[in-house]
């Protein structure tokens, strides 16, 4: 179905972006974001987002099962020791989810903002009118975390994870296409989702790595001599017996003591792969009744079908909803009052050559109407270092899949690597009559529904990111169970993304204003003391009255994070963990802007280079004005949130 490169050979790019480059100021991505946001608003509105997330959560047991089976069938061990594959909901959907929980404390909710507006005085309604659109999401994001300590194992496991993911996404695109194609034809649609499989002989498809039996078996299989020990147990020869040592027999006995328990619990999806492994090693083939994995597939497909029926009950692809999606998209496109530019050749275009000759241009026609947009069948693609291929058998569908394993990014003198693979589920939309290099074309627009990110083991933050704890949430209406990061972790991850990933000056980051408002609003509902502290920090001249810190300057910053400039008392970091980057940023900027221009320019140029930007002629006055605007806007938002908090307390 999909032929992946193994091991993955990626192009590692060393970006040199410039803040005035056309492709940075007006990226093509704006088009796709507008369309994706309109899709979620009108097709997958609030209740159907939950159903969609429930449907996507069934990917985890499928991927766990089939990745393990592929490992075994290809001569590898199943997951061993602390190895895990965990699907965690993240990003905008979870921020919005946590936000709605707090809003619902005001009473039964009929509209996301109406009840909240009733709970505050009229002076605060301006806040919600001003920021209402900031809380709309443009896609649902998941982290698919593969945890292993071995680079070779990661490459092998990820290969089978993606193959398994594509297999179940193929089934999901079939279901979504059926809902689209047979809208208003219930007599045709319902038989497609009819459950023909029973639940007999399946104990559980819940993913739970804390099972005692599972941990014991994975620990035994992680023994360095396990291959020898396994052969000694199942296929003993005279030479094996002669070579065996006491430690081999110890592992032999440990595994032997667990065999009955493994086979007895093989109706649990977590244990089944290990029963499958034993059967294959004893018989060499899958002729034992419990060796059939289809029973688990059938349960997963049954549950998928239930979610498909719930989505179809909402008539999500009715003409009304499709038209609303097109209208919102068109209105968004009309709001663009400039050309959009695509990079043509290099990732870096020197500022002095920053003209249209270096870019492909995209422009909407003067008359933009609903009939310019259309949903059409499309192929699914695998994008890799040297090209792009159609994924076999997943063709001509209105919902398509894009697997991207093409590039990694290295900054900070190659000390900071961001290496992620992405898998997208999109609705295939085209715009007819869009001008590409001034010629009318039928232009594909990616309307994103779900994105999966796999952090690769080469990434600098791999260990920290894949080992972040998660929690299990139960959404009651509709009934959905999902894994997610706790609020503290989620907010900190998004803060880091805004302040210490693409650039150290956050106003260079797309959608910065929206994201900081969302995060501060969410924090305000739970920890208002953070709002008070940030207000004091912004308004206090001597920051050391509030924070014990030290600044460090050196001759070269090109391999550093901006936040290496400062040390802060660990107690302060612990107390204000979620907003630590914001605290550090304010203190650093307040101090370095007092330096002589020569020293300040040196710091900014070096850190531009460190983060992969090219700006040899840093405009110091522009940076100073931008920072002052940043502080003013931040303080205004904090004051607005403070007003809401105190009005709520009355």
From Swiss-Prot:
Species this chain originates from: Acanthamoeba polyphaga mimivirus
Looking up InterPro entries in the UniProt record yields:
DUF5851 (IPR043881)
Instruction: Return the protein name.
Output: Uncharacterized protein L516
Q: Give the principal location in a single coarse category.
A: virion
Q: Which Pfam families match?
A: DUF5851 (PF19169)
Alphabetically list the UniProt keywords.
Virion
Q: Which family does it belong to?
A: Belongs to the mimivirus L515/L516 family.
- Localisation: Virion
Q: Which GO terms describe its cellular component?
A: virion component
Lineage: superkingdom: Viruses
């Amino acid at each position: 179905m999909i032929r992946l490169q193994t091991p993955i050979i990626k192009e590692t790019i060393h970006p040199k972006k410039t803040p005035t480059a056309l492709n940075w100021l007006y990226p093509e991505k704006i088009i796709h974001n507008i369309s994706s946001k309109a899709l979620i608003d009108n097709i997958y509105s609030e209740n159907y987002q939950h159903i969609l997330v429930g449907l996507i959560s069934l990917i985890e047991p499928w991927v766990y099962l089939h990745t393990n089976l592929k490992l075994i069938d290809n001569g590898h061990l199943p997951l061993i020791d602390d190895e895990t594959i965990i699907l965690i909901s993240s990003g905008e959907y979870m921020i919005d989810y946590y936000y709605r929980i707090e809003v619902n404390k005001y009473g039964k909710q009929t509209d996301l903002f109406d009840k909240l507006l009733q709970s505050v005085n009229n002076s605060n309604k301006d806040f919600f009118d001003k920021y209402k659109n900031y809380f709309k999401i443009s896609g649902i994001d998941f982290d698919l975390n593969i945890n292993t300590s071995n680079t070779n194992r990661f490459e092998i496991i990820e290969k089978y994870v993606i193959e398994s993911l594509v297999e179940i996404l193929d089934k999901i695109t079939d279901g979504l296409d059926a809902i689209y194609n047979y809208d208003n034809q219930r007599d045709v649609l319902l038989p497609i989702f009819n459950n023909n499989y029973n639940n007999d002989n399946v104990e559980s498809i819940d993913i739970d790595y804390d099972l005692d039996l599972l941990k014991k078996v994975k620990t035994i299989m992680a023994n360095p001599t396990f291959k020898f020990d396994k052969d000694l147990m199942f296929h003993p020869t005279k030479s094996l017996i002669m070579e065996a040592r006491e430690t081999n027999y110890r592992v032999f006995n440990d595994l032997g003591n667990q065999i009955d328990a493994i086979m007895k619990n093989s109706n649990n999806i977590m244990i089944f792969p290990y029963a499958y492994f034993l059967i294959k090693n004893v018989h060499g083939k899958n002729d034992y009744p419990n060796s059939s994995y289809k029973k688990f597939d059938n349960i997963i497909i049954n549950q998928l079908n239930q979610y498909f029926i719930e989505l179809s009950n909402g008539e999500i692809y009715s003409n009304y909803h499709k038209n609303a999606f097109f209208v919102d998209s068109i209105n968004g496109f009309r709001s663009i009052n400039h050309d959009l530019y695509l990079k043509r050749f290099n990732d870096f275009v020197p500022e002095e050559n920053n003209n249209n000759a270096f870019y492909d241009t995209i422009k909407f026609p003067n008359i933009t109407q609903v009939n310019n947009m259309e949903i059409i069948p499309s192929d699914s693609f695998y994008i890799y270092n040297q090209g792009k291929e159609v994924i076999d058998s997943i063709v001509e569908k209105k919902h398509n899949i894009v697997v991207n394993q093409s590039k990694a990014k290295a900054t900070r003198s190659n000390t900071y690597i961001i290496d992620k693979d992405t898998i997208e589920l999109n609705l295939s939309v085209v715009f007819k009559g869009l001008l590409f290099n001034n010629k009318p074309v039928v232009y594909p627009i990616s309307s994103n529904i779900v994105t999966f990110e796999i952090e690769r083991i080469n990434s600098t933050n791999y260990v920290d990111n894949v080992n972040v704890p998660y929690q299990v949430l139960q959404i009651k209406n509709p009934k959905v169970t999902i894994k997610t990061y706790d609020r503290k972790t989620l907010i900190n991850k998004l803060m880091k993304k805004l302040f210490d990933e693409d650039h150290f000056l956050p106003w260079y980051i797309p959608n910065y204003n929206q994201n900081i408002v969302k995060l501060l609003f969410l924090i305000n509902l739970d920890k208002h003391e953070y709002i008070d502290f940030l207000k004091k920090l912004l308004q206090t001249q001597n920051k050391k009255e509030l924070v014990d810190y030290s600044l460090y300057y050196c001759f070269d910053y090109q391999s550093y994070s901006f936040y290496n400039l400062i040390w802060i008392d660990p107690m302060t970091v612990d107390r204000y963990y979620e907003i630590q980057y914001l605290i550090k940023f304010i203190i650093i900027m307040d101090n370095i802007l007092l330096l002589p221009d020569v020293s300040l320019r040196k710091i900014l140029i070096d850190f531009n280079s460190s983060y992969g930007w090219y700006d040899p002629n840093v405009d110091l006055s522009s940076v100073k004005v931008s920072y002052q605007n940043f502080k003013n806007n931040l303080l205004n938002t904090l004051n607005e949130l403070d007003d809401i908090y105190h009005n709520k307390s009355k």
